[in-house]
């Protein structure tokens, strides 16, 4: 059995194969449908006679495909060709089965872009052209070759098949040259597009994450700075006595006033030269006695036979202290003012040696200093200091 199958060349442009069916004048021999035939020589020619029951033809399903009945229709069309007039050909049934198989194998199953073109040529019964699975464009450029005649039909129909060496190009639906739209390409598939979108979203999310992280670090540093400021303000509020302000501006105003008053007090103490205020009570009393003895040399007794030595009248000193109740205990008398120290001489007049006590404004100032340290006390001390500065006489310039 000889079958004609078109050759497939990958690099060539596909071309359609044509099949030309030509009838001959061979005589139709109905004995071909029998299983057993008898050869006889009649009148110088070879004849066939069928023996036995007729043969039942079965349809071949070897080359059938699921193309919706297209291949079956082509095979059926080829088998139902009209029988031509009988001719005197010898043994016309040798290639009876191979003709149908050749036509079945030579047919290409069409796809979506199918082009059916039926052409009839003079001298042939039917010619069928079947399109390939590519576009609807016309295919050409193949090599044409003639195939040896074959017998088909009921008996004496001879088929002459003109074939082309068809080249089929293996096309990839995912290549960029064969795709018209990007959405039809396999390369631009949905998972790949989703991956690209995820990459873009990942880049945006990384930028937003960096910004949020920087903002969080900035907020944390600002929070620490505010906590430090609040802690310093609380410590400063504790240093200011009787401070009841809560807002920062009022607290700072109180601190400023307090510092001004402290500065006035320090300047007053430095001008008056009062280091004894920093000494304990016993040392202050001892210093008072020493200064009183040194400042009043006339109070020394001379009539007791002890020249250069004298004793202090403690009773008179106590009476003088009792006669001046307005003087504070911490008050040190002015060392330049003589104390009331009468001598042991009874004939002497006490009035000559008694010096009147000069009221000192520092007593009131020091009395205020013993009170609890408040803003009013500091303001009162500052006022007294100003009055003292006004009452002091201007110093005389020696010539």
Swiss-Prot record:
Post-translational modification: Ubiquitinated and subsequently targeted to protein degradation by COP1 in the dark, but not in far-red light.
Knockout or disruption consequences: Plants exhibit unfertilized ovules but normal pollen tube attraction.
A Gene Ontology BP annotation from the UniProt entry: de-etiolation
Region Disordered, annotated ranges: 119-158, 173-228
Keyword match Plastid: no
Regions crossing the membrane: none
Induction section of the entry: By cold treatment. Down-regulated by jasmonic acid (MJ). Accumulates in far-red light more than in darkness and red light; this profile requires COP1-triggered protein degradation in darkness, phyA inhibition of COP1 in far-red light, and phyB-mediated protein degradation in red light. Follows a free-running robust circadian rhythm, with higher levels during the dark.
Regulation: Stabilized by phyA but destabilized by phyB. Accumulates in the dark but not in far-red light upon MG132 treatment, a 26S proteasome inhibitor (at protein level).
Annotated signal peptide: none
Pfam families: HLH
Tissue and organ expression note: Mainly expressed in stems, leaves, seedlings, fruits and flowers, and, to a lower extent, in roots.
Function of the protein: Transcription factor binding to G-box elements (5'-CACGTG-3') in target genes promoters, particularly in far-red light but barely in the dark. Required during the fertilization of ovules by pollen. Repressor of phytochrome A-mediated far-red light responses including seed germination, suppression of hypocotyl elongation, and randomization of hypocotyl growth orientation. Does not inhibit phyB-induced red light responses.
Complex formation: Homodimer. Associates to PTAC12/HMR/PAP5 which acts as a transcriptional coactivator. Interacts with the Pfr form of phyB but barely with that of phyA. Binds to COP1.
Protein name: Transcription factor UNE10
Phylogenetic lineage: Eukaryota, Viridiplantae, Streptophyta, Embryophyta, Tracheophyta
